[in-house]
């Protein structure tokens, strides 16, 4: 079954407000809406130009995702955000039991970084320039229609917007 509402997140793994959302708001949001099938959550990357470690971190998280550990890996990056300059990617991968060779090959693949840049281009084309930003909406006649929520808003803001979207016919 597909969820009636989709939230598309645009995040930067070096952004402190993105970390706040991921560590404080996301667990409750996931439990209440994603795990219950009411909302589909898609994470997209928007590495900001002044965050030198955001692109390599995004690539590493995607590569962890190829082995089924995206959200766990992302949480570890957010928790260790102050140490991103040390490029802890392989150590975190080992902690989650990822295949090191596969992980390294993925990180070295230029197509992965290109897909991160494509997410950023989509954000820009839709007027999204800050992180975290979210688009909460649904598909209507083949088009995604939604509203943008900017910043690490409290859970209540998401609940209000999601419930309003769910109430629409």
Name each region found by the language model.
Residues 1-2, 154:
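Short capping/connector residues at structural and topological boundaries
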